[in-house]
Each structure stands twice: as C-alpha cells, then as structure tokens.
Swiss-Prot record:
Originating organism: Synechococcus sp. (strain CC9902)
MF annotations from Gene Ontology: 4 iron, 4 sulfur cluster binding; aspartic acid methylthiotransferase activity; metal ion binding; protein methylthiotransferase activity
Family matches, as InterPro entries: Elp3/MiaA/NifB-like_rSAM, Methylthiotransferase, Methylthiotransferase_CS, Methylthiotransferase_N, Methylthiotransferase_N_sf, NA-bd_OB-fold, Ribosomal_uS12_MeSTrfase_RimO, rSAM
Function: Catalyzes the methylthiolation of an aspartic acid residue of ribosomal protein uS12.
Domain of life: Bacteria
Classification via SMART domains: Elp3
Protein name from the UniProt record: Ribosomal protein uS12 methylthiotransferase RimO
Length: 466
C-alpha cells in the first residue's frame, strides 16, 4: 500500500491596508492622489478610514509654523493609536532623519520628490526596514503616466503643470522644500486633461508654485498662453488658474483668458504687499511697478474678471506708513476675494533674520483692520450679481429640503464662497456634478443665493423683455 504526503501550500501574506491623511495645499493633494493610485495598482487595500488601516501615510505640510504644528499633532495622535506611520511631504523633506528619531512609530519618511517610490518604501517597511527616502534636491514631477486616484469631488480636479519654484521670496521656504521649477510639456498636461475629462471632471484647476512662469525652464520662456489655448480643445467647461504671479500676466496670457471660452476669467494674484519698500524687503522689488498698471489692464481687457489676492502684514520693517499705503491700495483696487496673513518667521528663510520685527499684537491689529475694510467691499462685489442668471456647478444636494449648494465661476473651491440654490418654480432640482442656470436673488459678504431657472421662468422673463 502506497501512502502519499501532501505538502502544505504557503499562502502569500496579505498586504496591509493603508490609509492616507492629507494636510496642506492642493499641490500636496495631487501627490497624495498619485500615492493612492500607485498603492492601489500594486494591490494594496486603500481605506479612507484611519481606524480601518494598520499603516497610515501622512502627507504633511511645513509651509509655516502653524502648519508644522498641525502636521506633528496629526502624527502624534496616530502614533498614540498604535498606527505605523509613513511620513511624506514637506515636513519629511524639511526635517528628514530628525523625524525618524523623534517618532518611533514612524517607519519611513518620503520626500516631496520621492512619492513615486511609495510602493517600494512600503515593501521595505513590511520587510522590517526603517526607510529614509528623501532626495536632497527634489527633481521629480509626476505626469499622466503615473497612476492617480482622485480624492476630490468627482466634478473638480487639480492638475499640476509644474513643480518647484525658481523665485526666492524672503519669507518663503517652498524652494527648499520643493526644489527649483520643473515644468511638464504642454502635450503631457493636455493628455492628462483629456483623461480627467473622460472621468467626468467639470472644473479643472491648474496649479504650480507660480503658474504664470509655466514653461520657462522647459522652453526658455513662459508658455502659459499657449497652454491655455491648447486646453481650450479639452471638453471641460471650466478651466481655472491658481497662483498667477503678476509679472507673468503678459498681454498674450490676458488675451488667452479673453479668447478661450472655457478659461474662467478668475485671476488668483498673490501680491503680498503694495509698498515698494516692503516688496524690496520681500525680495519682490520688480512687482511695485506692476501692481496697479496690471490690475487696470486686466479690468480693461476682462471686464468680468474676478480678482483674488493674498496679503501679508507685519513683515519686518513694515511701518505705519507702509501699512497705510497697503490699506489705501486695498480700498482703491476693490478685490473680489482677499486672504490676509500675519508674517510668520520661518527658519531657513532670509526674512527670519531681518531686524525691526513688528510686534505681533500690532500685526494682528493690522490684519483685523484690513479684514474690516475688505468685508463691505466683498459684499458689494457680490451684490453686483443679484438679478443676474449664472451657471452654477452643483456640489451638494439635500433631497429632504431640495436645497442645493454649488459655485459659480467667481468662486474657487474651498477658498471662496458658495451659491445656495433653491429649486426652480417648477420644482426643478439638480444632482451634484451638473451645471444649472441660477438666478441670483441675494448676496452677503461671502455667498450668493438664488433659484434654478426652469423653462417657465425663462419664457416668462423673455416675454417681459419683449
């Protein structure tokens, strides 16, 4: 009688489930989405619930001290829950080995130019290594061939046209965290835009550190105008540009805004200040001769342009005279949207060592004064839209009340206001991700209200006009 022995089969070890915690800007978000896509393609389970995962990848921010503290609080909180951590992004690039030494639960750090290696990093962590994958000088930029799984609303996507920055503003640490500018070819960007259009994206937001400098490193001169015209062939209704440096808004770029139908006339201009002395101290001296002339040209060429800016108060050496100059500038230019920040000294930047620091209480008072000045201006700018019918991209819908929330072209996601929409006279409602015509009936400092314009309303309005 012959006996046989069955050898036990070895089952492959299950891959750990991974969750992501995203902190910081939308450029960081795109990096997170690439890491999610890479891990999903490699067979890892990716969860939106940190409780459900054994490993959490935290894509961190290190732009200012408040952001660093938020990143560290997130890391410590997850560590205390017993999670294994992979620290990615700007905090990892900034502090590198110090993070591994400070947080035993951190199994790896991944720099801003190294996120494309996330699968290899995780495999090495699974094998018991502690991994430092941080390039001294970030040089990578993702493209349309790198897997990506979006984490934003299905109707909205961010598209990174370049990475890094060649400017050296005195207050900014980004070049040390992200490296010098490296642009993607126009063909690569357009190819990814087509991919996103096929996914149903209705609004595409172009981002980089200085989007108006797009192409300078690659082509020898900026090519934003050519890029916008190429993207005009993509079937996405709204294309919005963020982070436009004022000196890069040339006549050809403004003409592209005017001529390309799906480019939204929304200009995000981080001006930071108006006074030549402060701009010189910020290492932005050329901007002083540009601000007012540029804004006048924009309004002449694009009468419906929506203008957003960011300003810094309390920069070292800012006097009361400088502040009054900025206050007058804000009052006369009448921006639609303004973000105002107090100066934050960042180690490793030129401004950190500047003398004549402004007292924090004085800086805060200046910020409060500018906010008080801007709020009625913002309300007045919104009020101009009352009575008009505009296209609104619906993002939320309450089936119980019928109320919808969306945005018209004058509002960018997250940083600006919303449009609160009621059903039309015929009860018409709209699903998230769709555009509907909305008649604006009310406005406040930040938001608009209105109702869907159905066929009956349009016919009635046409009869009145006739």
């Amino acid at each position: 009688m012959t006996s046989t022995t069955t050898q036990p089969t070895t089952q492959p070890m299950a891959k750990p489930k991974v969750a992501f915690a995203h902190l910081g800007c939308e450029k960081n978000r795109v990096d997170t989405e690439h890491m999610v896509g890479l891990l999903a393609e490699a067979g890892y389970g990716v969860s939106t619930d940190e409780e459900d995962a054994s490993v959490v990848v935290v894509n961190t921010c290190s732009f200012i001290q408040d952001a660093r503290e938020e990143s560290v609080r997130t890391l410590v909180g997850l560590a205390e829950q017993g999670k294994e951590l992979i620290i990615a992004g700007c905090l990892a690039q900034h502090f590198q080995e110090e993070l591994l030494e400070s947080i035993p639960e951190a199994k790896a750090i991944v720099g801003t130019g190294d996120y494309q290696h996330i699968v290899d990093v995780l495999q090495r962590v699974e094998a018991g290594e502690r991994v430092n994958r941080v390039s001294a000088v970030p040089s990578f930029v993702g493209d349309e061939h790198l897997p990506r799984q979006r984490t934003t609303d299905q109707a909205v996507a961010y598209l990174k046209v370049a990475e890094g920055c060649d400017y050296r503003c005195a207050f900014c640490i980004i070049p040390k965290l992200r490296g010098d500018q490296r642009s993607r070819p126009i063909e690569s960007i357009v190819a990814e835009a087509h991919q996103l259009a096929e996914q149903g994206v209705q609004e595409l937001i172009l981002i980089s550190q200085i989007t108006t400098n797009y192409g300078l490193d690659l082509y020898g001169k900026p090519k934003l105008a050519e890029l916008l015209r190429a993207l005009g062939e993509v079937e996405i209704p709204w294309i919005r540009v963020h982070y436009a440096y004022p000196t890069g808004l040339t006549a050809s770029v403004v003409a592209a805004y005017r001529d390309v139908p799906n480019v939204v006339p929304y200009l995000d201009l981080p001006l930071q200040h108006s006074h030549p002395d402060v701009l010189r101290a910020m290492n932005r001296p050329w901007q002083a001769d540009v601000n007012e002339r540029l804004l006048n040209e924009i309004r002449e060429q694009l009468p419906d342009a929506v203008l957003r800016t960011t300003l810094i108060v309390g920069f070292p050496g800012e006097t009361e005279e400088h502040f009054q100059h900025l206050k007058h500038f804000l009052e006369t230019q009448r921006f639609d949207h303004v973000g105002i920040f107090t100066f934050s000294p960042e180690d490793g930047t030129a401004a950190a060592d500047l003398p004549n620091r402004v007292d924090p209480d004085v800086a805060q008072a200046r910020k409060d004064a500018l906010m008080a000045l801007q709020q009625p201006i913002a309300a007045e700018r919104n009020q101009r839209w009352v009575g008009k019918t505009v296209d609104v991209l619906i993002e939320q819908h309450n089936p119980q009340t019928g109320e919808m929330i969306g945005r018209c072209a004058r509002f960018a996601p997250e940083v600006d206001g919303e449009v609160h929409v009621q059903p039309g006279d015929d009860g018409q409602q709209a699903a998230p991700g769709s555009f509907v015509p909305v008649k604006i009936t009310g406005a406040d400092i930040y938001d608009l209200t209105g109702h869907i314009v159905g066929a009956r309303s349009m016919v009635a309005e046409a009869r009145v006009k006739d």
